[in-house]
Amino acid sequence: MNYTASNTSLWSLVIQAGLIAAFLLLANVLRRKVPFFKRSLMPTAVLAGFLFLILRTAGLFIFKAETLEKLPYNPFDTTILEMMTYHGIAIGFIALSLRVTKKDESAKGALTAPKSGALIVSTYLVQGLAGLVISLLLYYLFFRADSPVFAASGILLPMGYGQGPGQANNIGNSFEALGLNGGRSFGLAIAAAGYLCACIVGVIYINVLARRKKRERAAHEELSGSVVTVGDFQDENEIPIAESLDKFSVQFALVLLVYLITFLVSWGIDSLITGLAPGVAKTVSPLLWGFNFIIGTLMAMLTRKVLGVFRKTKAMTRQYQNNYLLSRISGLAFDLMIVCGIASINIEDLSGLWVPFALMAVAGGAVTFVWLRWLSKKIYPNYAEEAFVSMYGMMTGTISSGVMLLREIDPNFTTPAANNLLTGSAFAIVFGAPMLVLVGLAPQSLVKTWITLGLLVAYLALLLVFLLAVRKKKAAQEEPAADGNRE
């Protein structure tokens, strides 16, 4: 085997990974030492992605053009960045879904988790409506000469804001294949704008709360990392830390095994649909592979259930999953996904799309703010501010953005707001299933884009009835008790 620099297949990924690591470490130093970045609450991975993007786009790297020409490989290969973004979201969700869950007796009979899931999906729908209204208006007014797929490009707003760079990359890529020039970069740019929105709007809102004395911002000393205890690291009767196979190796092997199963299941479904209905396969296939993280999540949950059955029947005497290490794997995967997703944006691809991008970015932040502000007061009356801040951070960035904003006003997580993000996301997979169909329907034709708009409104109305009717029923049951207490 050729081990020299001329072997691009051997060294390209290593060079790219080294650059990503360098930007992550640089961003971490800036985040800790520079007051501006410290106060911004911008996640380190987001800052690293923007640094990578700015330097790559502006051509400010140390290498001269003639030096780059002499290299046998491109050290700034966007293809590898796209690949890592695609795999990162799937691996991250698989690792999260493999974690052993514990029954919460206090949550029995409560509807907070399903209502949180419905709130998350309803926000997707509101973002989708705002995006489609903008893209349809722009199409009829200015973009008639473009592909009709442009009219459906607004559906990328919830993919970028609500879902993050992983889904924005996957669905944007499928839109690009259908005729939307620069669709992948457009989706990723919206996701990047979502992070900025979470940081800027979120921090401003927290400062307003502090000035009005409604909440106090936590001191940065309170937000420092805590000590990890043995109880945090492992559960009872887990496999040893170091045996013939290292404990981390077991976790990584489980994740990769589930991802292999995910590939085989996706390939099997794709082959079956292609054999039975080739016409349908042209539409379904890109969506199937684009939403591979959902199939991965389902396969991981099934694997977790099978391992649980093995333990109950004593076929397996020890617990193989370690929640702490699986969380670290998912954290790494999501950090890589965020850095690579932002860094792989091709600014040139956005030429001609700056107006819709700007309108959707502003509209997305505004409608998400108003929608979540209204419903947080109704669904979480006892901790509305904490719930709103965390949900807004997640629905414009990722769950880490929501947690970082929440820690500024609830550093010890004394409210259930942080837990709602996790339990709500699980229910959002169920509530969000129709959304996947609509994402695939919208770009097929102009008529189907309008149908999608109508279906978004109808589904939003159903979720709103669920969210508010349940609350009204509960309030009606508690009202007599409250009257009795006053007597």
Regions found by a protein language model. Name each.
Residues 34-41, 67-81, 99-119, 308-326, ...:
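Interfacial helix-loop-helix linkers and transmembrane-helix boundary segments
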Residues 102-134, 190, 250, 255, ...:
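Entry/N-cap segments of selected transmembrane alpha helices
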Residues 23, 50-55, 77-110, 298-309, ...:
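Hydrophobic transmembrane alpha-helices of secondary-active transporters
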Residues 121-122, 134, 145-182, 205, ...:
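Alpha-helical membrane segments and immediately flanking helix-loop junctions
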Residues 1-10, 210-249, 274-283, 308-321, ...:
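Intrinsically disordered, low-complexity non-transmembrane regions of multi-pass membrane transporters
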Residues 36-39, 100-114, 139-151, 173-185, ...:
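Juxtamembrane helix-boundary/capping and inter-helix hinge elements in multi-pass membrane proteins
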Residues 336-348, 357, 361-471:
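C-terminal transmembrane helix pair
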Residues 258-379:
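Transmembrane helical segments that form the transport core of multi-pass membrane transport proteins
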